[in-house]
Every structure is written in C-alpha cells, then in structure tokens.
Amino acid sequence: MIPVSGFEGRTVAVFGLARTGLAAARALVAGGAKVALWDDKPAAREAAQAEGFELTDLTRADWREFAAVMLSPGVPLTHPAPHWTVERAREAGAEIVGDIELFARTVNAAPEHKRPKIVAITGTNGKSTTTALIGHICAEAGRDVRIGGNIGYGVLGLEDMHGGAVYVLELSSYQLDLTSSLHADVTVILNISPDHLERHGTMDEYVAAKRRILLNQGKGDTAVIGVDDPWGQRICTEITAANRRTIVPVSASKAMSRGVYALDGLLYDATGERAQEVADLKRARSLPGRHNWQNAAAAYAAARGLGISGEEAAQHLMTFPGLAHRMETVAVLGKVRFVNDSKATNADAARQAMSSYPKFYWIAGGLPKTGGIDGLIDLFPRIEKAYLVGEAAPAFADVLRGKAPAVESGTIEAAVRQAYADARAAGQEAIVLLSPACASFDQFADFEERGEAFRAAVQKLADGQADAA
C-alpha cells in the first residue's frame, strides 16, 4: 500500500467503506493517522469490523475533531443535494478530500528521487479500456506499472511508490471533484458527452469536473485530448492557446495535420513532420470498432508521452487481451455469438457497440439515464429485436414502438433465453448484444455483477445444450 503522509497523529474521518474507503483507511493508519470510519450500510460496517477496524458513528461525532473528511466517490457534493456528511464537514470547517487527493499529496511530499510517473485518464466512455491498454503497453515495455483508480483498484492500496514506477489511473468525474493537488505527467481526456448530470447538475459542471485532470500540469508534461466531440475540441483549443505543455489531439473520425488519429482502422502518428501509419488496428482482435480505435490512439499517444518509442507502443497495442464487460465475446453457441458490453451504462457508450454490428438482438435497460435511448434512433434499423429489462423497460418499449420489435423481458436471464431462441430460429449467424444504455443499480450492485449475470445465463444455455447432446 501507499502510506498517506501529512496527517500523522491527527484524525481523518472516512465515510464509505467499500474498496476505496477501506484502502484509504489502511493507508492513513499506515501513515500514522487515526481514522474514524462509518458507512450508512450495515454490511459495509460489518466488513470493516471484520478487518479489525473500530467504527465511529459519524452521525453523533464531534466533527471539529477531524483534520479532514475522506469521502468515497459516490457521495454527492452538490446534486441532487449535498450528502449529510458534506453538510457536517462544512459546518465544522473540516476539509473534504478523496483518495486521489490523498495520493497526490503523498506523492508531492515525497523526495524528488522517489516520485513516480503518473498517467491520469478520464472521459465519458472508454476510460477503463484505455487505462488497461496504457498499463499493458507500459508493462510490455518493461516499466514497473501499477493500475488503479476507478478501474476497480483503490489507488492507495497499490504498491508503494519509487522513482521508476508508473501509476496509470482511471479517474471519474466524481473522483476529480475531490481532487486539486494531482500533478499528472500525462493526462488523457478521451471524450465527453452528457452523463451523470443528476450528480453534477449541468453539462458545464460535468465538463469542469473532467477538466480538473489538467490542473497543475506544466512544461514537460503531456495532455492527450480526444477531439471528436465539441467539448473535447474546445478544451484542446483553449489549452493549446495557453501553450504550457505538449498537447496531442487524438481522433478516430478524421485525419489531422498534428496529433494521433485512426482512419478505417489504420493508426497514424502525425506528431512529427508528416503522418506515418504505425498500426493496423483491424488486426487487434480485442479492439473492435471505432470507439476502440480512439482508445488505441489515446493509449499510443500517452505511451509516447512517457518516452516509449512509437514502434514499441504500436507493437504492444496489438497484443492487448481486452477487458471483461467491454464488447467481450462470452460464448458462441452454434451460429449465435453472445457479446457482453455491460459497461455501456449510457446511450453514447451503447452506440459504440451497436455501431459495430450491422444487425443484432439487443438486450437493454436498467436504471435509465437522462435522455434515455432517444439519441440512438438512427441505429434502430439494425435491431432484429430488443429485449428490455429493469426500470427502463416500459419507457424504452415506448421509444422503440413502430421502429423495432421489442419485448419487456424483465430480467437478464429471461432476455438471454428469449434472444437466443429468436436468433437460433432465424438460422443465420447472429449477435446477441448486452449493451444496456443504463446504469445497473436497479437490479445489480454494479455493471460487473450485471455482466456476470449475462455470462451465467449464457452458460446455463450452453449447459442445457450439452445435457441434451
């Protein structure tokens, strides 16, 4: 772990005792701080106690005793309303921080020879794939790399730092809201589209949270900016005018005179005097579709920012094994391929997967996001049939009515069973695509659990076929 410095002998309240909170609590104690731990959920409190932590009921505590309050990323700061912990901290004058801020301060306080390189990645979609891809390139290039953050590994639980290490961190807008001291050697903003507006209030506030990743960069640092959306293009233009760092625009939709871009699956490096083709991404089996070409362009540019040669970065792109729940083929039964894209928690992410197939049987729904699936109407002709689950099912059925066949399946298991029956009956090669365009929290703990439910339902079909054989 990374012992947190700066709070020796003082008490830090930690609210939220899932992976991030517990990793932070361990790191604070290792650094000499005292901790006051609490969570609204009894199961989370029990897990902390099972690990040997004492609990402090923060609803009854004197908050003036806390040097800082460490909040887990899911705790709302402003919208739809400030969480009670936020109000109590502000009343007591206690500083509110997140685990990334604790990490950043610890790095900044370390001697120069011990400070690692930091790559920080954000964006609306593609963060996890790009984070894992950069980590893969670094590892294959012989770097001592540690991957963490929003990808599922609390940063403070990673191995302690040294001057030769590279930390590759996926950062959500929630985490960036609580971060002000991070200085990343390489930053990546992949793309920006409307998401999490129930948490940020407005699109301007959401974009502002994403831009926080650029704080504290200066001469010698690199910013990789996706310019295929208007928000990214605007950020790129504005920071180019500031002229403080190396800026590398990336695109998967257009050729550029400067930057890194992918056209028809071919990756070009235009950071030198002329554009050079460096990779044929269509040969990278784990990076299908234009959205993954953007991820690859960003990862390549980030690796170059770390001093890895273009030839080596391109070579290691091709051996990336992929990530679970991101356009992951989980099984092929006869002529039917089952694709798990459970990570598609909004319509824009679902668009990436839907655009990759000419026809598909679509499993969608869950806890709806603002805007629903209205923005996907141009892709409805590709839908052989839709199988709708969760809270969004009735609303999605209304949107699809008259445009694509749809049925309200209710559960993932029922949807898989129905989709397979229809695809099998058609007698042709077919895709059954789970790309929900929704959050998962109405039926599952997270998108991973939803993806595993899909995998289990497909396995049940496979087992049934084996028994019948």
UniProtKB/Swiss-Prot annotation:
Amino-acid positions noted as binding ATP in the UniProt annotation, renumbered to this chain: G123, T124, N125, G126, K127, S128, T129
Catalytic reactions on record: UDP-N-acetyl-alpha-D-muramoyl-L-alanine + D-glutamate + ATP = UDP-N-acetyl-alpha-D-muramoyl-L-alanyl-D-glutamate + ADP + phosphate + H(+)
GO terms classed as biological process: cell division; cell wall organization; peptidoglycan biosynthetic process; regulation of cell shape
InterPro entries for the chain: Mur-like_cat_sf, Mur_ligase_C, Mur_ligase_C_dom_sf, Mur_ligase_cen, MurD
GO MF terms, alphabetically ordered: ATP binding; UDP-N-acetylmuramoylalanine-D-glutamate ligase activity
Keywords: ATP-binding, Cell cycle, Cell division, Cell shape, Cell wall biogenesis/degradation, Cytoplasm, Ligase, Nucleotide-binding, Peptidoglycan synthesis
Top-level EC class: ligase
Pfam families, A to Z: Mur_ligase_C, Mur_ligase_M
EC number(s) stated in the UniProt entry for this protein: 6.3.2.9
Pathway(s) where this gene product acts: Cell wall biogenesis; peptidoglycan biosynthesis
Family: Belongs to the MurCDEF family.
Protein function: Cell wall formation. Catalyzes the addition of glutamate to the nucleotide precursor UDP-N-acetylmuramoyl-L-alanine (UMA).
Annotated protein name in UniProt: UDP-N-acetylmuramoylalanine--D-glutamate ligase
UniProt organism field: Phenylobacterium zucineum (strain HLK1)
